[in-house]
């Protein structure tokens, strides 16, 4: 009777294995001590014959209770490693037994930290890891999917057949399997069978490398195999706060900065050409650059321009080029479009060698519905909310993370730490923060659910952002955490222990909209809109602001920066120069999008590269020269950055000359007798003797003039500077009598003598 029960149980388990419905394969497979003897059971779909090979003995395994379940009876304890010899259709191969490795990979402490949302290095456990177990090299797979009925590893190793390698379910919804037959470079997915019997093929949420789109499998990849030489950079970065330093950021999209001819293939280190990544929407005969080519071309360009940082639009793996990277499916993998993870590491390493920081756009606010991604991951709403009123951005067609779930927060917070630790990035810009903070964001009445207090705030998202920033600065005190937050949510850049969100910079969206609205107006009408150009100072010290002219302002029919400007070409160039110069002298850190630095004419298009041929024309060279010189001046004059967030650093001289559309102000360093006087003339009218009050007498050297001939201007100016005269104006006893060029900004520095 006992043997009958045992046989029925074995047959039932075998049927479950065949139907991919077994969550505990170790219960039946691998070595077992049964009725005073050792047996090894092996599950080998479509095998004709199976043998168990030890160092000195071979045992034939017999099919029992099911044609694919084989059992070998051993005379002794199988303590040593063994191999399985499998014959299928006349072909024989040998492999190690995945189910002979029974030790748990995810320990009790790891599970506990993950379950409470505090495992900051969870990527070292989750995903696919090249390890050695019982002196055998292989890959340990580990995934969180608590609602799955069963999960299998599928890939080239088993012809993508989920019946071959079922995973073992552990405590906490963790699934594991050691695959001794797999190695670096192997492609895989998780085949997940839901409680309802549906089957999903999912890429690894923690995968370190993924296939090039349109394929979407994950690829086994080594993690810690790169030799960094930026220790001095990292030490210096984390030794003090970065926000009290000059920050000038070049925002860019790697795939549309510069393209290469398909005739010029990238040559690998081994001398072989790399096949171009397919991109049907690019111009015929062109291809994307690789990470090594970007290292060679982009970094010197950014260094020559004088920017302190590069901001990369999302490079985490994403299936659709047209999303610009903002619909992420591979959170722990740099996109394969441009090369390998180590090639991206070398890009960052080289940036640091050249004194350039690297900021990544990070998108924890939503994720796409692609079938291979996080959506409905284990047959349930695991990463997202089940109710679309709080779990979906219908306008974007994406899903919202369930921030109330500890493991989901852990996935995201650890991802933040991962990019800093494994790729040495220096900062993040969090996209669309407002969409996270408000439950009714882009939602009509009746299509959102109030929070527990009846309000529209997303309390769980607030707590997540606070946790993410707290953990980030705990690990990397010199990091930059920049919020793209478009509302008046308070205390975005205040510390979390004060109730703030914990960012250290926030894009000043109000300044950006006011400036663009103002500069699009015909200069004659600007006299009626003076408030647009001055209002930002009234709230400037409520947050740590960064002034940004971003990619969002040069797409979807908005025109690129140059073509937003009114008038003929000369006025467009002059207005552009004036806006950029005013931006560099206004309190706040700086960010501009690629192409603005030389006057790109066409709107940004993700499929096209920049109009580099424009640099053959002097006006465009002039704008680039202006940006170069502004960055150099900015870094050399502490008054332009040292007190960005302190009212002491800025003082109006006159902001009320509406009829002339002229403003003047001072930028000051700490307790020094040197300061800068900035005078802006936002009309095409020239003023030959415009008086501006100054605090003390002395010589004021003209250190910058956006109308200079080097920049394509008319070269009107003040012959190198002006001596202050005794004249009472703007509440000062001294004044400068200046020539103000048309559509220009001039900068003067006080000196004790000429």
From Swiss-Prot:
Alphabetical list of InterPro entries matching this protein: A-amylase/branching_C (IPR006048), Branching_enzy (IPR037439), GlgB (IPR006407), GlgB_N (IPR054169), GlgB_N_E_set_prok (IPR044143), Glyco_hydro_13_cat_dom (IPR006047), Glyco_hydro_13_N (IPR004193), Glyco_hydro_b (IPR013780)
Enzyme Commission no: 2.4.1.18
Catalytic reactions on record: Transfers a segment of a (1->4)-alpha-D-glucan chain to a primary hydroxy group in a similar glucan chain
Catalytic residues, chain numbering: 431, 484
Pfam families given in the database record: Alpha-amylase, Alpha-amylase_C, CBM_48, GlgB_N
GO cellular component: cytosol
Keyword Repeat: no
Keywords of this entry: Carbohydrate metabolism, Glycogen biosynthesis, Glycogen metabolism, Glycosyltransferase, Transferase
Biological processes per GO annotation: glycogen biosynthetic process
Pathway: Glycan biosynthesis; glycogen biosynthesis
Keyword field contains Glycosyltransferase: yes
GO MF, one example: hydrolase activity, hydrolyzing O-glycosyl compounds
Top-level EC class as recorded in UniProt: transferase
Quaternary structure (record): Monomer.
Function of the molecule: Catalyzes the formation of the alpha-1,6-glucosidic linkages in glycogen by scission of a 1,4-alpha-linked oligosaccharide from growing alpha-1,4-glucan chains and the subsequent attachment of the oligosaccharide to the alpha-1,6 position.
Family of the protein in this entry: Belongs to the glycosyl hydrolase 13 family. GlgB subfamily.
Official protein name in the record: 1,4-alpha-glucan branching enzyme GlgB
Native source species: Prochlorococcus marinus (strain MIT 9312)
Lineage, uppermost ranks: Bacteria, Bacillati, Cyanobacteriota, Cyanophyceae, Synechococcales
